Amino acid sequence: MSAVTWFNQLPPCRFATALRRLTSIFAITFVVFGVGLLDSQAEAQPLSCSQLLAVKIPAYAIGLPTTGAVVTATQSVAASGTGTSAVGAYCLVSGSIMPIDPTAPNIDFQLALPAAWNHKVMMFGGGGFDGSIPSVTGNTPSAALNAPSPLGRGYAVFASDSGHQDPTGTGAFTVNHEALLNFMGEALKKTRDSSLFLVRAFYAVDRPRKSYFAGGSTGGRESLTVIQRWPEDWDGAIAFYPAWDFAALTLGQLHIAEAFAAPDAWPDSAKRGVLFNAALAACDALDGASDGVISNVRECLRIFNPATALLNGTPIRCPGGADTGDTCLSDAQLAALKSVEDPVPFYYQLPSGETKYLGNNVYIADNGIPNPSPYEPIVTELALGSAPPAFPVTSSMLFDAQISDGWIRYTVVDNVNFDSLTFNVSNPGPYTHRVQYLSSLDAIDYNLSRFADKGGKLLLMHGTADMTVTTRGTEYYYSRMQETMGDERVHNFSRFYLIPGFQHAFSTVFNPAWDNLTELEQWVEQGVAPRNLVVEDTVGVFGRTRPLCEYPAWPKYNGSGDINSAASFTCAGSDDRGER
C-alpha cells in the first residue's frame, strides 16, 4: 500500500497516531484540524504534483464543518516570462471542498505550488458575489506594473470561488444557508486549511514561514474577515476598497439605484461630464495644482453645490429646472445626486453599530463621462451605468443596482419576483431582523488586537471617488478601529491610504499602482514600516506620480516643480501624528 493510500484511509480516531507514524516515514509533523503547525523543518519526502491527485483531505483537518475535500486535477506548468514577469515552474492543483448540506454547492479552489518555494503563502480574495476562482497567477490589487506577482516571487498561492459557481453574480446561491455562510466568510477558513494541507504534503514541511492575504472590494472584505476571525492564521493583509458589512453596503447601493430610478432622475453620460467638469472648475486648484485631480476632497465637498455651480460662467442647473438637454442638469437629476451624496438614515441599528448609510462622493467622481480612456466602459458600469435603473435589472444598469437587486430578492426577501426598487432602505419593515442578522455574519469587528498582538500588519487603501463601495465606509471602519484600540496602537500595525480621483478598482482620473506587497513584506518580516511612499498613475496621465498620503492627509502641490512628480507635492491635512 502506498503512503498516500494509507494516509487517505485513516479513520478519525487514528489520525494523531497516524501522523506520528508519518513523521517517522516522511519526517513530517502535522497538527490535527489544520490550524496549528509546528516549527520543525526536518528532511522529508515530498509528494510529487501527480501524487497530490490521490490525496484526500479529511474533514477533521479543516477548521470548520465540511465533509472533507478532494483534489480534482493537477498540472505541471513550465516556467514562463522574463524579468519581473517571470514565473518559475509550478504545480497547479484544483480541488473541491464538500459541504455538510448535500444540497449546498462545493467550494472549488485552486492552488499554485512553485518548484522554487519561498516558504510563504498568499491567498487571494474575490469580487462581487464571487462565484469564480481568482487567478492564482495574478498580482495583488493596484500592484506596480513592474512588481512580480506573488507566484513569481515564489509564493504558494491559493484562492476559491467562496462556495458557489456563478460568475454572472445573481446572488441566487444565498438561498442555501451553508452557501451563504461560506460567502460571508466560512469558505475562507475552509480554503486556507485545505490548501495548507496540500502545501505540507507537497513540500514536506510543517508550516509556511509567513502567510498573507490580498484582495479588493469583496476581496477586501474577505481580507478583513480573516484577520478578524482567524488572526492566528495570518501575518499580513492587503484590504483595498473593502466591501465590509456587505449587508449595510448593499442597502446603500440599493438607495443609489432607487434615487436614479425616479422619473427623469438619471443623468446620461454627457450630463455627468457637465457635473464632473464643474466640480473640477470649482475644486481642482484647491490642492494647489490644476491637474485634473481633486485632492482636497473635504474642502471641495464643503464649497461645491451643483444647484448653484457654474461651468464657463453658466449655471449647470437647467433654466427653470426642467430638462432642456445635455448641457445642464434638471432639478430631478440634481435631487437624485444630492440624495446619493447625503447620508441615508436607518431607523434601526445594525450589529456593526451603523445607523445610516454614509453616502457617496458622487459630485467629484467620473461617473461615466465622455472619455477616450480604455477604462471608461468599466468605470461607467461601476458608477451610474449606461441605462437608468429599472426592474428587472439588466447588465447595462449601474453595478450597484445589479448587486443590490440580487441581494434583496434572494437573500433578504427570498422572493425571486420581488421588485427590489420598492424595498424601503430606511425602514425595511418585516425584513428588518433579516437585515440585522445578515449584517451580524460579516466583517464588523473593530478590535483587531489579536492580529496586532501577534505582529500582524494591515494595509488599507481606498479611492476618494468610489461609487461602488463608498469611501466613507472605510473611513468609518478605520475611525472605529481607532476608537476601539486607540490611535497609536492602530498606527503601530496598520496604514490607511486615500487615493484622490481613484474610483472602484479602475479609474480614468488617477489609476494607482505601487509595490504594496513589498511594503507589507518589509513591515512584517523586517519591521520596516511604510514611509514616504509614492504611487504612480497608469491611466489618467500615464507615469505621473504622487505621494501616497496616509489618511486623512492628501497631496498638496508645493507651488513649484514638475506637476507630474511626487517630489513637487507634500502630504497636507494630517492629524496630530504629523505629516507622513
What are these model-predicted stretches?
Residues 215-225:
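Glycine-rich nucleophile elbow surrounding the catalytic serine of serine-hydrolase chemistry
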Residues 1-20:
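N-terminal secretory signal peptides that target proteins for export/translocation
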Residues 206-216:
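Alpha/beta-hydrolase fold nucleophile elbow
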Residues 22-37:
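Bacterial N-terminal signal peptides
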Residues 460-462:
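Short beta-strand/loop motif that positions the catalytic acidic residue
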Residues 42-120, 133-138, 143-145, 276, ...:
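Catalytic-loop region of hydrolases
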Residues 118, 127-205, 251-252, 417-431, ...:
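Cap/lid segment of the alpha/beta-hydrolase catalytic domain
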Residues 225-227, 232-345:
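A catalytic-pocket lid/entrance helix-loop region that shapes and gates access to the active site
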